[in-house]
Structure formats: C-alpha cells, structure tokens
Amino acid sequence: MASPRAVQLSLRKPTHAVCVVGVETLVNVYSDVPKGAKTFGVSGSSEVKIYMVYDPSRVAEPAGWAHWPLDANVDVVVVADTVSKDLYDFKVKVSYFESQEAAALAHSVLYLTAVDVSLDVDTGRTGKVKKGSGDKKTWRWGPGGSGAILLVNCDRDIHGSREDLHANHLKSLEDLQDMSPMVLSCGGPDELFESHKLVLKASLSDSRRLKVFCARGGTSLSNYKQVLGPRHSSYEVERHSGERAIQFYVEGLAFPDASFSGLLSLSVSLVDTRPLSEVSVFTDSVTFRVAPWIMTPNTQPPLELYVCSVTDIHGRNDKFLEDMSHLATKANCKLVVCPRAENRNDRWIQDELEFGYIDAPHKSFPVVFDSPRNRGLRDFALKRILGPDFGYVTREIEFAGASGLDSFGNLDVSPPVRVGNTDYPLGRILIGGSFPKPSGRRMARVVRDFLQAQQVQSPVELYSDWLSVGHVDEFLSFVPTSDQKGFRLLLASPSACLQLFQEKKEEGYGEAEQFDGLKHKAKRSINDILADKHLRRDSAHVQKCIDWNREVLKRELGLSESDIVDIPQLFFLKGAYAEAFFPDMVNMVVLGKYLGIPKPFGPLINGRCCLEEKVRSLLEPLGLRCVFIDDFLFYHQLLGEIHCGTNVRRKPFTFKWWNSVP
C-alpha cells in the first residue's frame, strides 16, 4: 500500500492543500514547531476525520482534552469524507503547548479542498461498475478473486469492414457492448480545476494493446471520442463545469501471447499545474486482464455443423452433405454449408479453423481461430464467419510456410478433468508434435505460444508425427456420456482390430472380406489380413505410438483405463509414416449423443459389418447413437475422414474462466 501524501505545516501562514475524498493525508506536525513546545493537539472541520497513528508501547492515548507528546513519533492522518463545495472550505488546526495546563504557544492552520477522484471498473465481475470496490490494481484468479476483464473487440458490427478493433472511431453504438465500462469520478469545486487537471494514462506498451473511448452522452457516434490507444498513451481529461463523473469504454486489441501476459493498466492523476514543474497530487489505477480465447470440447452441446460442398473426379459430394444434414437434424443442430465458390474446392474445414469463444461478465461471443494453413478456405473465416458478435483471430508464420501439423485437425481439447489436486475446469488443449523423436514436425511456435498464453486450458503436446498427415484427430476423440465421469476417451487400436478379426476367424468367418461393398477398392479377407506380416508389423509399430500417447493422456488428464475405449482400427506404413488402412473411425464428428462415424466397410458377418457392430457394442451402452457415414471416396482416399471435413461450433462453458486458478 502506498504511503499517504504528506503536507508540511507552517507557523507563519496558513497552508493550503488538496486532498481526495476517502484518501489519507499525512499532516506533518513536526515541520515547524514553536520553541519550548512539548505537546500538541489537533482539531478540525466536521467533514474531516482525524486519526492519530502511534506505537502503543511508547505512548498511551491521552484522556479527555489532554495533548499528545511531540517526542513519541505520533503521526496525524486526516481523511475528508465528503466533497468540498468551495475552495479550501475544510480546516485542520494544530496547537502547540509547553505543558498540559498552559495556553497554546502557537497554531498551524491547514485549509483543505476535498475532491472526489476515482477510476472505477468492474472489479467485482458482476457486469456493473461499483465505485471504490477493493484493490483495483491487483488482478486475482479464483472464486474469491477480483479484477476487471477486457474483451478483445475482434468481432465486426458493421458489414464490409475489418474487425472493430482496427477502427479509430466508434462505428456503431452496439460496439459499446463489446467494451468494458470505466467511470472517472471528478467531483469538486470548478475553481479547483482551473489550476489542476486530470490526466488519463497507459504505459506505451499497454497503449498498443487497448483503446479508450470517452462518452459524452447522447446517441450520436460523435459523442464517443477515442482518447487513448496505439497513437496516444495519455489524455488530458476535458472536465465540464459541475461534472462529477465521466464515462469511458475500454476495448482490448490483442490476446495474451508469448510477449503479453494479458494484464493491462490504466491510471488517472490529479495534477497541480501551478508550479513550474507540474506536480501529481493523487493517482488512482486499475488493472484489466484480457479475456482468453477458450476452446470447447466434444462434450459441449453442438450449435452449428459446418461442411464444404466440393466437386472432384467422383462428382459432387451431395450424398455426404445429405448425410450431414440428417445427422444435424437428429442432433437439433444447424447445418452450415460452405459453397465451392467460398472454399475453392478445399474440403478440410476442420484443418482451416477452430471455434472458441471469449467471455466477460458483461458480454460473451464466439471467436473463430483461423489457422496459418492458408489454402482454399483461407478467406472463409474472415469473410463469412466474422460478423456482429462473432470474432476472429489468427496467427501467421513469418518467413516460412505452414507444415501439416499447423492445421487444426492437430488441435483438440479435452473435457474438464482433475489431475491429482489440480482442476482443469475448462479441459486441456491437445496438440500433436514429434516428441519423443529427437527431430521432426511440430506445430509452429507462434501457434503454440498463443495457445499456452491463454493459461486456462494448459496445453499437452502429444506424439502425432508418426502419421503421414500428423494430426491428433487421427487417433483420438472424446465422446460425452451420461454417467458420473461425463466422457470417454476413444483411441484407435490396431491390437483391438486384429483381436476382433482373430475372433471372427475362429468363429469360422475367415473368408469374410474387408471393403465389401466398395467398387473402387480390392477386397481382402480376414484370413489374408491376419496372414499379412507387413500389416502386422506396421500395426505393432502404430500400437506402440498410440500406447505412448495413451500413457501421456492418462498422466496429463488424470484418466484411468476405465475412462478409455479402444476403437478397432488398422494402419499401414507408407515409408516411415502411417495411414489408415480403412476409414478411420475415431475421426468422427460428435454432435451430442449422435456420432457421425466413417463407415469402415468391414467384413460382413450375417449381413452386418463386424467393425460397426463392435463399435456399437462399445459406445451405445454409454447412451450414444452411432451413425456410420460413407466418406470413402471424397475424404478417406485423400487421407482424411469426417472430422477432417467438418467443424462444429459448440455452446460455451457455463463455468467462468476467471474462477479458475491456472
């Protein structure tokens, strides 16, 4: 806590000073003491509270009208509890005595003008500004925490423009809802502000990451003036006669990142302009934290399902779009089809973007994270998704192109988990990389740094560089369940698939064929698959890679074996990297209890696909509904599946991120 401002007294003439309502002022009774004085007494106006600060081990509080000793280091602190009506209308008098019974040797007089200067924000996180609510300079996490929250104003309230944060003037009154309110109290005699000014400031680094707009009433956009921002780090406040409070609105310009913690501070100073060198009388400060970008896991209810309309040598993917429409209808989810004119025949919408959201007590809205992949869908998020109350953020890779691991099929998030004594109420981000290999492909540092800096979904890096495409969604998924755990982790499992095929062989179905029903793929019997030494060798290698991730996931997400479901799946090696042997079933789209699963075209046993039946037996007892969809020609043959070719915007968490403790 800062020391109170000190005022020096004089026996020769009255002292005049300015104080702030509710703020302590130290009156220095030792600066000019009459000769022979040994004690002193203090009196003052009724509007001024007088406090004596002393060490009880050195001096006792005098009784009645007795005086205080001058040799006991007793401090006098005064606090005005109301605003002055006129200049210097409050009085404090200090009288000095030689003894308790003697008349006063001399008097010092202090005349005070009390002003109300306070910078206030929503430190209580209620959505409303409350004056003088606790420590405004310190931002604290947790349910009992405090501190204001700032949204990055990354949506677009006016069609045809860029994100609102790029504008130097207010473009719509609706845009104020995306900003955090801030109130400057400035009550006091108008005459005082002829010799004093109020200065609103941010540091140079902070001013590059926020903007402040001053509101002057009315409904015209011209009533809102930008006063702080990248070009202006200080602003001399224009206080009107009789004005007691001024409304401001603050917007964020940047998300937390490697070089930015997310904390931003603003201060207001009452400055005395009479001296040759201006003197600050009082400063009040507030601190904001920029709201992080938050991902939503498969366990959150779906709101919109995105899919692309494309054409290739097999024609148009109309049947797949129809299947997606039926699935979305079952899940009561809106279907959004991105036309070919907007996707440039790029079908991999999962790789292009990731839906998340930002949240503050006064406002929340979805924000799409556009990957640095920049292929046919590169303009879709910016041109078609960005809009009113729908934000946009991206990260670009400088001096190099994006690798396959920079696509957002390589970005996922777990449901909420508890690991030991640590809670992750918003889950943990999962990305794929090359570890434990000494070298290989990794997600670009600029993306990893961004994800890490959000703090509330502490990322875990998995091993995905064993795959040709290299994405985590090729070997894992999460599904919601209605039991106490609330979810299961699905892992692709070559061992489970080979075991299933062995069981079917022993039951007498060894001649049943994989890829039955496909015109464009040679069939292979169960016997042939089980006898394929190369496929078995590849399966053993892939299983080791998945098992390595299994242990990491168990450790980092606090999972037990009962939380994991092994989904039968075979892979083969092409060079040093693995690809799915048949449509990869864990690469599914999850819409509540409805799962859109790539149809595996497995061996038919009594007219039913044994792979589908196995997956149903694993998942449907958990309350899930398996819908198998043919994606073979348009997706699987191009090394992707349903999850790669779809994207889902989900309902935000009800849990408030500021109640977490990273």
Curated annotation (Swiss-Prot):
InterPro entries: Cupredoxin, PAD, PAD_C, PAD_central_sf, PAD_N, PAD_N_sf, Prot_Arg_deaminase_cen_dom. Signal peptide: none annotated. The active site is at residue 644. Its EC number is 3.5.3.15. It comes from the Eukaryota. Belongs to the protein arginine deiminase family. Monomer. This is Protein-arginine deiminase type-1. The gene is Padi1.
